[in-house]
Amino acid sequence: MGTEKMVLVVDDDQAVLETMQILLEGHGGFHVHCAKGSLGANACFSAHAHLDAIIADVLLAGETTGIDLCNLGRRLHPQVGLVVISADPHVEMEGLPKNSVYLRKPFGGNELFAAIEQAQVLAQPT
């Protein structure tokens, strides 16, 4: 793995997960773990001592939201960059973690890479 950045992508849409994985790994420099909800995300949190970024859809199947997972991820990995995504323009953003980046679907690769970079900068201690 070397200097690859470790990214966790959480979405309940398999097509979105696959597209994001292809995009992030194809761009280079990213090692991607995909989770189709909170169970997969929690397993990834347990399995990896380090994550550079978490990208999570706000609305997930079940009771846990992407915001909940980002908050948990930040507690477990204090310097993780957080990117919250959603296609719903009216989604409730209450509880959005401090220093996270919001990105509205649909978005392009350049927007995603810029959001990850911005989230990582915001997550660094001052």
Language-model segment annotations:
Residues 1-8, 18-21, 108-126:
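Non-catalytic signal-transmission and effector/linker regions of two-component phosphorelay proteins
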Residues 14-33:
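Two-component/phosphorelay signaling modules centered on CheY-like receiver
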Residues 36-37, 64-69:
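Acidic catalytic/metal-coordinating carboxylates
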Residues 57-58:
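Active-site residues of response regulator receiver
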Residues 67-78:
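Short amphipathic alpha-helix used as the core "switch/output" element in two-component signaling
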Residues 85-86:
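Hydrophobic/aromatic residues positioned on beta-strands within the core alpha/beta folds
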Residues 105:
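A Lys-centered signature of the CheY-like receiver
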